[in-house]
From Swiss-Prot:
GO biological process terms, semicolon-separated: brain development; glucose metabolic process; lipid metabolic process; lipid transport; negative regulation of cytokine production involved in inflammatory response; negative regulation of focal adhesion assembly; negative regulation of lipoprotein lipid oxidation; negative regulation of monocyte chemotactic protein-1 production
Species: Rattus norvegicus
Lineage: Eukaryota, Metazoa, Chordata, Craniata, Vertebrata
Keywords: Disulfide bond, Glycoprotein, Lipid-binding, Pyrrolidone carboxylic acid, Secreted, Signal, Transport
Protein name stated in the entry: Apolipoprotein D
Tissue-by-tissue expression: Expressed in liver, kidney, bladder, adrenal, cerebrum, duodenum, testis, lung, spleen, pancreas, heart and skin.
Similarity field: Belongs to the calycin superfamily. Lipocalin family.
Amino acid sequence: MATMLLLLATLAGLFTTTEGQSFHLGKCPSPPVQENFDVKKYLGRWYEIEKIPVSFEKGNCIQANYSLMENGNIKVLNKELRPDGTLNQVEGEAKQSNMSEPAKLEVQFFSLMPPAPYWILATDYESYALVYSCTTFFWFFHVDYVWILGRNPYLPPETITYLKYILTSNDIDIAKITTKDQANCPDFL
């Protein structure tokens, strides 16, 4: 009984103190991903336009660059401007985990951490991309991660509305999505 109370108290703490994270009961949903995904067209620079806030991204002006590695995997370079004005960057590696669904990638930033799902739900390769990730904990709750990316620092409102519709039509909660201001950001990729 004491163990159950401790577990419930811990879970309650997670749900109430994790700023921005999107915790939900049940396992991760499995939304459809981009059909006929072409990773080579996806390579290059992307700007973070909107996202569900995550504990590992605290800065602004977030940009990502994807490039092909010699081993066939994808180098991921994320950069952000910290609140104190310094530049923070993290480098990782992504790979296609299932060639029958090439838009389902796994990304790993630190060797001691397991790879995380990185699913491209939608992209036109030239202007927008919708990325979804989810982690299930203890088989009965999950955390959603969402990124709306643009090839330019701005996306038209109708594009953002369309991408949010994809999320909601797949039972992915968008209530905590925030807009990331890319105005007056340095070009650091």
